[in-house]
Swiss-Prot record:
Residues 23-44 have a biased composition (Basic residues). NCBIfam families: rpmI_bact. This is Large ribosomal subunit protein bL35. The keyword Ribonucleoprotein applies. The lineage of its organism: Bacteria, Pseudomonadati, Chlamydiota, Chlamydiia, Parachlamydiales. Belongs to the bacterial ribosomal protein bL35 family.
Amino acid sequence: MPKMKTRKAVASKFRVTATGKLKASRPGRRHKLTGKTPKRKRQLRRPGLVDDGHLKTYKRLMCL
């Protein structure tokens, strides 16, 4: 059976932590920023962890 190819689009959006979880940048920080509070924009800078419901799918696409 051949090797699975990594989905490069998925691999470019996520980073793997030391414990095997996935980190990704948060959505909502590209445009329409005038309606958001400074606190909300500041918190959107930090990357978030992928929830358990999607973790298995993304890991399979990244061949982990």
